[in-house]
């Protein structure tokens, strides 16, 4: 199940952590309750027992965690930010309460991972897709490798400092530090459902990585696989670039014969079959993708060459 908040880029840049957490949780909970209600309505209509097919995975978009995850650069030790710890581990009112109260699920979400020197200065930062099978201690981040110029780093910013001001004027927020590109092209094994010993190799794609075919194919293995793309297309506002992005991504399915699910903050959240066909997408009654909501889908996870 993919969750979309449809936040504008400017609002995304000045977001308050508590409000984002609450909005993600509320939207996820409402989506699960809607699935339950639909199953019950269908059972009543057909005169049969209700079959509740609840989501095994919940996917939140790129940079959904408004508070960065911090690590010690020299050791890789994670600093337990209390807000993030509570959000994932507290028994009441947060993710764990949702798991206990409605259904257990594995969370895949966008995070910003910051590595600090022993003196407390920022050494490097990564834009990640992170898997949480349980509480905060279960975090498994995968860092984005294909960074976007003027979106995740400013080329030659020391030589041309005016570029930073130009970026801030167009994006509505300061750039901050440049992201560091990740290096791993290994799929991330994720249980098909919580507690299962059977796994699917997730091909983790952040933002525009889903359009770079030469990069995506490095993750292909002869095993059950699924491409997961988390993105924030708020930069495009309501232009046709949102549609162009996901339609370009659909070619990765055709090329690699792998399904894909895209969770967009703003843009097109869609589930695609291995032939690029749309299994499900999130749109309002007018057909516009610029809406808040959830998208639930079941995808094939074959390992065709």
What are these regions (language model features)?
Residues 1-305:
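Enzyme catalytic cores with a strong preference for nitrogen-chemistry domains
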